[in-house]
UniProtKB/Swiss-Prot annotation:
CDD domains: ALDH_F18-19_ProA-GPR. PANTHER family: DELTA-1-PYRROLINE-5-CARBOXYLATE SYNTHASE, GLUTAMATE SEMIALDEHYDE DEHYDROGENASE. GO terms for cellular component: cytoplasm. Catalyzes the NADPH-dependent reduction of L-glutamate 5-phosphate into L-glutamate 5-semialdehyde and phosphate. The product spontaneously undergoes cyclization to form 1-pyrroline-5-carboxylate. It comes from Listeria monocytogenes serovar 1/2a (strain ATCC BAA-679 / EGD-e). The gene is proA. This is Gamma-glutamyl phosphate reductase. Its main location: cytoplasm. Keywords: Amino-acid biosynthesis, Cytoplasm, NADP, Oxidoreductase, Proline biosynthesis. Pathway: Amino-acid biosynthesis; L-proline biosynthesis; L-glutamate 5-semialdehyde from L-glutamate: step 2/2. GO terms for biological process: L-proline biosynthetic process.
Length: 415
């Protein structure tokens, strides 16, 4: 708890400094950080390799090791992502609305930082940089708590970040890492109301549920991605195959990857054999319901948990449905309100799907893999929010701000 209190107090002070920093000052510091990450590539890879070796010794699946791995190319991508954040418009100070009331007061609404943000996350060390940069750009101090499996990578990245920001004239406590990765410290952080203004968990269902059950700090939930592809009877076969392969196989370990295929009974016989052939190239394990197994002889029988799980692996659950309404009901029962897709050339069916499915992002004839700040065209994001309060969907710079009212008067008093 001592580490949390010390770093929480320092973060509060840093937040006051950051709130006054100009966009020019923040961008200059971020450009320096982008260069410093490249300069320290060798040492970052050396520390990351310690995490990789430890993960292999524990028998961690390769798909999860991929989330943990840094490479020279990935560090270049991280560095470039920092530059992309520099290019984004700074929302701080933006006046979103202004009007006069009956008392002739001029009332303005402007964007301000949230304050001190806490982020608890798991294996991906790139989150250490992404989260730091986004919070910094929006004038927020941030306290990060990564997983034990990436601790050496995170400590190395944090050292580069803090040294770089300090060299640019900012407090080292603008961005901090909790190095104690114990569950007890994580739970203490969830109750750090005295210092944290908001807590954002990024990770699997178990982590997010733990935060929701234990946190007294306000939480923005970045949900897991049990994403579905529904292939309608009016779907174009090759389009359906291409989208499914991309959504499942391009990067199965991320939250916007597809986990379940729902397919209309009228096209199941014609589509499923070709879908199976396409997925075999990636060694995807198929877990199918009874009707789908009659067509897919090499598939395994799906269990109830298969409809609920976020596999994050080359595994796909498959179910044959009688109608779009059955598909919608299945998604609303088992989905995590993240990203859902329909493949159909019938306009009315597509409209019904997007109106009835409860999710942050609903796709018509496109892959779920586009649920990402850069892919959607508004820049880097801190995570994908699956809740409805404060933010929903990819959380970019604007979602890391609050608002303040500024009222200009000329001596008015209220009668």
């Amino acid at each position: 708890m001592t580490e949390l209190i010390k770093k929480g107090s320092a973060a509060k002070e840093a937040a006051q400094f950051l709130a006054q920093a100009s966009t020019k000052q923040k961008n200059a510091a971020l450009l320096n950080l982008s260069n410093d990450l490249l300069t320290h590539t060798a040492s970052l890879l050396e520390e990351n390799n310690k995490d990789i070796i430890r993960a292999r010794e524990k028998g961690t699946p390769e798909t999860m090791i991929d989330r943990l791995r840094l490479t020279e190319e990935r560090i270049k991508e991280i560095s470039e992502a920092v530059k992309q954040v520099v290019a984004l418009k700074d929302p701080i100070g933006e006046v979103t609305n202004m009007w006069k009331n009956e008392a002739e007061l001029t009332i303005g609404k402007t964007r301000v930082p949230l304050g001190v943000i806490g982020i608890i996350y798991e294996s991906r060390p790139n989150v250490t940089v992404d989260a730091s940069v986004l919070c910094f750009k929006t004038g927020n101090a941030v306290i990060l708590r990564g997983g034990s499996d990436a601790i050496d990578s995170n400590k190395a990245l944090m050292s580069v970040i803090q040294d770089s920001l300090e060299a640019s004239g900012f407090p080292r406590s603008s961005v901090q890492l909790i190095e104690d990765t114990s569950r007890e410290t994580a739970r203490d952080m969830m109750r750090l109301n005295r210092f944290l203004d908001v807590l954002i968990p990024r990770g699997g269902a178990k982590l997010i549920q733990t935060v929701l059950e234990n946190a007294t700090v306000p939480v923005i939930e970045t949900g897991t991605g049990n994403c579905h592809i529904y292939v309608d009877k009016a779907a174009e076969k090759q389009m359906a195959i291409d989208i499914l392969v991309n959504a499942k196989c391009s990067r199965p370990s991320v939250c916007n990857a597809a986990e379940t295929l729902l397919i209309h009974r009228d096209v199941a016989d014609a589509f499923l054999p070709e879908i199976e052939t396409a997925l075999k190239e990636y060694n995807v394990e198929l877990r199918a319901d009874e009707r789908a197994r009659e067509i897919l002889k090499d598939s395994k029988a799906a269990t109830e948990s298969d409809w609920e799980d976020e596999f994050l692996d080359f595994i796909l659950a498959i179910k044959v449905v009688d109608s779009v309404d059955e598909a919608i009901n299945h998604i609303n029962k088992y989905g995590t309100k993240h990203s859902e897709a329909i493949i159909s050339n019938d306009y009315a069916t597509g409209q019904a799907f997007h109106q009835k499915v409860d999710a942050a992002a609903v796709y018509i004839n496109a892959s779920t893999r586009f649920t990402d700040g850069f892919a959607m065209g508004f820049g880097a994001e801190i995570g994908i929010s699956t809740q409805k309060l404060h933010a929903r969907g990819p959380m970019g710079l604007t979602e890391l701000t609050s608002t303040k009212y500024i009222i200009f008067g000329d001596g008015q008093i209220r009668n």
